[in-house]
Amino acid sequence: MLNNYNSLAQPMWQNGPAPGEFYNFTGGQTPVQQLPRELTTMGPYGTKHSTASSTTGTSVLGIRYDSGVMLAADTLVSYGSMARYQNIERVFKVNKNILLGGSGDFADIQSIKRNIDQKMIEDQCCDDNIEMKPKSLASWMTRVLYNRRSRMNPLYIDVVVGGVDNEGTPYLANVDLRGRSYEDYVVATGFARHLAVPLVREKKPKDRDFTAVEASELIRTCMEVLYYRDTRNISQYTVGVCSVNGCGVEGPFQVNENWTFAETIKGY
């Protein structure tokens, strides 16, 4: 019965650890782990995630009216506090149903815009005549931005998504760098949250939506106020309009400047 018994003690651990090392539970086979591209760029002292923005765009304002949406943003991209790039559009046409406006780090805006363009190409490759809707894009962006935030390497952007669905229903939403989102008849980023949103809410009729003419007038007034009050704004801006008739970006337009009221401002 004991003829085949090996009296020699077997090692307790196969592939056991060397002194000062850890046990290799994979038996010497180390799986290849593909890290996300933004986590693999090593510097001389390790990986450094960006913690601040260098080239930034300021406010984006979006207003929903009875048959569509309007988005507006100035054309300035600042380098720190310097008005470096003064002819850069920050309102984009995504497809015939969607407009996108971005503020924050402009490099991150370009990055997410390239990803969105790639998704539009994938939709076209399916050749099923089904295009992404604004609500779908906003939902997808919440997942992307929350995923980047959870990896402690966020995209420093604050975006406005607007458009119309197949039934012609307008949609307007805001998504921030943490993936938080909300819908409303007026959304804004940057200083426009404090300066423009109260102006729009004050003019909102109680029993109906804005008309296209009313929304256009509010856009003009709000961009004028932002130019006066926000040091990162300039007088030139573009307006994106999306309705059942299609989407497009119009402009650039100029603010009607009038600085005569400055004579009465005292104390600073």
Curated annotation (Swiss-Prot):
Q: Which Pfam families match?
A: Proteasome
State the Gene Ontology BP annotations: centrosome cycle; proteasome-mediated ubiquitin-dependent protein catabolic process
Give a Gene Ontology cellular component term annotated to this protein. proteasome core complex, beta-subunit complex
Task: State the compartments where it is located.
Answer: Cytoplasm; Nucleus
Purpose: Non-catalytic component of the proteasome, a multicatalytic proteinase complex which is characterized by its ability to cleave peptides with Arg, Phe, Tyr, Leu, and Glu adjacent to the leaving group at neutral or slightly basic pH. The proteasome has an ATP-dependent proteolytic activity.
What family does this chain come from, according to its entry? Belongs to the peptidase T1B family.
Which protein is depicted?
Proteasome subunit beta type-4
